[in-house]
Each structure stands twice: as C-alpha cells, then as structure tokens.
Amino acid sequence: MKVLVTGGAGYIGAHVSELLQENGYSVRIFDDFSNGLERRVKNFKDIFEGDITDREAVLKSMEGMDAVIHLAAKKAVGESVSNPLKYYTNNVGGTMNLLAAMSLKNVNKIVFSSSAAVYSPSEKDAIEESDPTDPLSPYGATKLLSEQLISKVGQAEGFSTISLRYFNVVGSKKVEFGDNSRDNLVPKVFAAFKEGKSPEIYGADYPTKDGTCIRDYIHVQDLAEAHLVALKQLDTEVDGVYNVGSGTGYSVKEIFDQLEESMAVKLNPVSSARRPGDSPKLIASIKKIEKDLGWRPKATLKEMIDSAWAAEKGAK
C-alpha cells in the first residue's frame, strides 16, 4: 500500500513514517519543512516538498497513493489565540485541499491527526469520545472543524476515515527524531535548562490536586503504533474517532519531578500566568481504541521522559 504522510518530517510524522516503512508500506513524505527536519527523513526516497495550503502541490502529491495519514498542521495553542486566521487557513484550508485531492485522485482512506484540544473543559476522571466538544482555543477549533470536514466529505465520497485525538505526546525513538518544537512542556524545559534559565510552570492556581494542569502523556512510539492499527482498520471502518493517550493523568509538577530524576538535576521551576486556551485537566478514556483496535500503550512516564532526554542530549 502507498501512503501519503503529510507532515511526515515532523516530530510525530517521522515516527509514524518510519514505522509504516518498517511494516512494508510505501511512504511518500509531504512536508514544507517549516518545522519538519530533513534529518528525520534521510532514509526516505519519496519526499514531496510542498505547502498543505497549495492546492496544486497537494493534488500532485496525491498521484498514485492508496491512503493518507494527515498530520500537517500548525499546533501552538497560544499562537492560535493571537493569530487565529493563520490557523484556520493552514489547518482547515489544508484539510480541505487534501480532501479535494483525494476525491480527484480516487484515494479513499484517511487517518487524521486530531487533538484532545477539541474537548470542552471537564471534571471527569477520563474523557470519552462522546463527551462534549467546545474547544477553548482556535487550534482546537481547527482540529474539530477538520474532523467534521473529513467525516462529512467521507460520507459523501465513500471514504473510510479515522480521526485520532492525541493527548500529550512525549519521548523519542532515536536522537534525530526528538521534539524540537519548544512549544510542548518537556522540550521547553530542556531549552530553559540548556540556557541556564528556570523553566516556567504556566498556572499554579488551577482547581487540581497541586494547582497545576493535569495531562495525559503518551510515548510518541505508542502513538505511531496507533496510526498503524488505524490504517489497517480502514479496510472495515467507515467513520471512526478514537482517543489516543495513556489513560493516566500527571500534573505538571509531577512531570517536573520525573524530569529532575531523568536529568539528574534540580530545575527550580517558577510559576507564571496561565496560558490562554489551556484546560485544567485532560485525561483520556482509551477503552474504545482498546476494544475496537486492540491497541494499548506500553511506555511508562519514566521511559517517556528518559527517551526524550536521551534524544535532547544527542541532538546537534
């Protein structure tokens, strides 16, 4: 099977692309390399450099493909609040271009990279796929709109579609695949440490056990495995949505405790104001994906943070 992976040179996309290739899939990487890195795709021959908002480029990249895994997107929550037009243009407009190209090139399978940011704030112990969606940020709104587009166009066109709602992704399979975004908590801490600064905790006054946000963390390699099983499921699945997390919540302070253990340092974090668009608590219920796809995460929090730090130390 020939699979187009948009955003395939990104942090998550590279892990997904390599796993697909290891499992016998023919992979075409589509990336504009604005955030993706060439070093992550050095073992791929079929690379299409293009912008997801360029309809003609997307159409050309679709030639000869059997399925799509769509990860290409802008993803900084704070930036989406200050510049929502950029996010709607790129994330929703790009998804529209992709669906149009699929229709024109008779490609009828897609796995979409969605987000837990689509959900309404919740006090539930674990969020289920059927729970209310009312995103706090434009980023989350673009993911929800893209899900809806994929579902509705899929129904009209006869596509098989699955949207995977990621929770917080961390870790790395190898050095060159590490997360360089600096928007996510763990790489942001690494950057502050290397610069000799105290890392920040954004908000210590949330209604949680220690005042900091609670999040569900998943190892990026476990997430890549979820894409693989979702792709296989497209042979029978018509229109699916699945949470992808560990099913366990960790506070930001607990993450800092593990970071200090893995890095063997004292980080001395300082508390700052809340970031706009952040929910107090987001923990996944993963019962549906366990039942329907037979997928379960494997990595512990220690393994996630250890692998992230190993990649950070080895990065050039």
Task: Show where each model-derived region lies.
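Flexible, glycine-rich beta-alpha linker
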Residues: 119-120, 137-138, 162-183, 208
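Aromatic/hydrophobic pocket-lining residues that form π-stacking "cages" and hydrophobic walls in ligand
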Residues: 98, 150, 189, 230, ...
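Short-chain dehydrogenase/reductase
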Residues: 80, 88, 136-144, 167, 179-187, 216-217, 241-244
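C-terminal substrate-binding subdomain of Rossmann-fold SDR/epimerase-dehydratase oxidoreductases
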Residues: 193-316
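N-terminal Rossmann-like NAD(P)+-binding domain of SDR-like oxidoreductases, especially those catalyzing
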Residues: 1-165
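Short aromatic-enriched loop/helix-cap "lid" or pocket-rim segments at secondary-structure transitions
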Residues: 39-41, 123-125, 173-178, 213-214, ...
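Mobile, glycine-enriched helix-loop/loop "lid" segments at the mouths of ligand-binding/catalytic clefts
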Residues: 174-200
